[in-house]
């Protein structure tokens, strides 16, 4: 058991007071057997006239804020505490039929997994197909766990991480051609790669805890983090982080899951004005382990 505290602050600045449209937030983590939400606090400045909570089609918690006043600065501050149960040594408890690839999902699972199997991005020349099939053993079945772990580490070791300020994700063929991308680009590449093999995969948005850099000033990547899940019969949805080579949920705080990255944007919204009115956006994410923070305080005392 590990208690992690996440402070996520996003600030928009404008040249003059602008009329703010609705803003959609995905800050509240998903409760599950491996992470339990202890506390959640959301402070928005200026204060909205209404905050409306919903569940989206994937069961994610979404808050929608509506504003009345104009403002030259808009700030969202989310603080959460989660009880995290890390899986340090993933054990693929897959059904016997799924221990080696290729395999097929059974008739009970398939209807619910279809949308997560269907590919969402063009690959006219089969570049993704060709790339992922390099990891299959020639002429014989490939152990499923080994295949997915190898693919995860191949992205981590074979591609260059680049923090991109641009919104959205690169198409997977662009990531393969360029050999670089952000965490969301790598997650999407792995999703499309395993989908090309007929496996169900989905996008995950959340936070990353970096133990080696823990402390009051630790910035958990400076932003939100993204990875993916693959559905394995008997094991369920298993986490794979190709940016860091993480298999399982270790150091990953899950906030939202979706079929496509566009459905799991942490914060989005509009304002009435010209593009020149927007001066910029600043995002700061701080992830701290309470046990480590207490140890640090004790050592300095």
Regions found by a protein language model. Give the residues of each.
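Short low-complexity stretches enriched in small and charged residues
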Residues: 1, 29-38, 156-159, 182-188, ...
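Secondary-structure boundary elements
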Residues: 97-181, 189, 197, 259-261, ...
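Flexible, active-site-adjacent loop/turn segments at secondary-structure boundaries
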Residues: 12, 16, 25, 42, ...
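Hydrophobic/aromatic-rich core segments of domains that either
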Residues: 138, 153, 185-275
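A broadly conserved detector of short glycine/acidic/proline-rich loop/turn motifs that flank catalytic sites
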Residues: 16, 31, 48, 80, ...
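Linear, non-domain "peripheral" regions
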Residues: 1-137, 141
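Structural beta-strand/beta-sheet cores of well-ordered domains, especially the beta-sheet scaffolds
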Residues: 2, 8, 21-23, 40, ...
């Amino acid at each position: 058991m590990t208690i992690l505290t996440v402070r996520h602050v996003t600030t928009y600045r404008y040249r003059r007071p602008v009329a703010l449209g609705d803003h959609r937030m995905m800050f509240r983590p998903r409760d599950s057997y491996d992470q339990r939400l202890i506390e959640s606090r959301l402070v928005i400045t200026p204060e909205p006239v209404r905050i409306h909570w919903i569940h989206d089609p994937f069961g994610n918690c979404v808050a929608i804020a509506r504003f009345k006043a104009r403002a030259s600065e808009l700030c969202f501050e989310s603080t959460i505490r989660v009880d995290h149960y890390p899986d340090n040594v993933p054990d693929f408890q897959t059904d016997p039929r799924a221990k080696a690839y290729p395999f097929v999902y059974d008739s009970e699972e398939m209807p619910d997994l279809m949308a997560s199997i269907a590919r969402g991005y063009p690959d006219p020349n089969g570049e993704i197909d060709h790339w992922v099939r390099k990891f299959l053993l020639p002429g014989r079945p490939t152990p499923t766990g080994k295949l997915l772990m190898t693919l995860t580490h191949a992205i981590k070791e074979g591609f260059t991480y680049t923090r991109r300020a641009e919104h959205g994700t690169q198409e997977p063929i662009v990531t393969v051609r360029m050999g670089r991308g952000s965490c969301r680009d790598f997650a999407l590449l792995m999703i499309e790669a395993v989908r090309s093999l007929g496996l169900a995969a989905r996008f995950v948005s959340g936070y990353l805890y970096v133990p080696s850099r823990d402390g009051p000033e630790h910035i958990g990547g400076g932003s939100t983090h993204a990875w993916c899940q693959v559905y394995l019969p008997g094991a369920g949805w298993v986490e794979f982080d190709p940016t860091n080579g993480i298999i399982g949920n270790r150091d990953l705080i899950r906030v939202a899951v979706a079929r496509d990255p566009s459905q799991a944007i942490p914060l989005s919204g509009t304002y009435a004005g010209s593009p020149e009115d927007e001066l910029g956006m600043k995002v700061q994410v701080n992830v701290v382990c309470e046990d480590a923070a207490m140890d640090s305080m004790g050592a300095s005392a």
